[in-house]
Swiss-Prot record:
Short name of one Pfam family: dUTPase
Cofactor requirement: Mg(2+)
Family label: Belongs to the dUTPase family.
Record function comment: This enzyme is involved in nucleotide metabolism: it produces dUMP, the immediate precursor of thymidine nucleotides and it decreases the intracellular concentration of dUTP so that uracil cannot be incorporated into DNA.
Protein name: Deoxyuridine 5'-triphosphate nucleotidohydrolase
Gene: DUT
Catalytic activity reported: dUTP + H2O = dUMP + diphosphate + H(+)
Top-level taxon in the UniProt lineage: Viruses
Record EC number: 3.6.1.23
Gene Ontology biological process terms in this record: dUMP biosynthetic process; dUTP catabolic process
Single annotated GO MF: magnesium ion binding
Organism for this UniProt entry: Yaba monkey tumor virus (strain VR587)
Keywords: Hydrolase, Magnesium, Metal-binding, Nucleotide metabolism
Amino acid sequence: MSKFIVYVKKSSEFATIPTRSSKKSAGYDLYSAYDYLVRPKSRVLVKTDICLSIPDECYGRIASRSGLSLNNSIDIGGGVIDGDYRGVIGVIFINNGNSPHYIKRGDRIAQIVFERLANVEIKEISNLDCTCRGDCGFGSSGI
């Protein structure tokens, strides 16, 4: 199995290179480059001050850290990092709780999971094939 190489550039002295907690961790932790106050029921764009060069066959998906979600009611807003994006990685940090959340420089705020890109072709058709499930969604297959 060949390894893909993701190149990382720090855009400031406050940036931290992403790390994995263990060899089997799917995601690489992302770190805040600055201090932030995230008020209850609000969101903040948290800068990491890193830029990435992701291989053409991949993209990066920003995901929440389970402990922040469970213990602090923190969510991460949609985050897909395309392979051709070269700007600073920012994380949409959402506080769904009733208390302010303080982020300190160097805190782990999210994780990035590198996934293989499916190269598909989109074709318009007038009818789709039938399935047992049909158009039933949102819990129709069981909870």
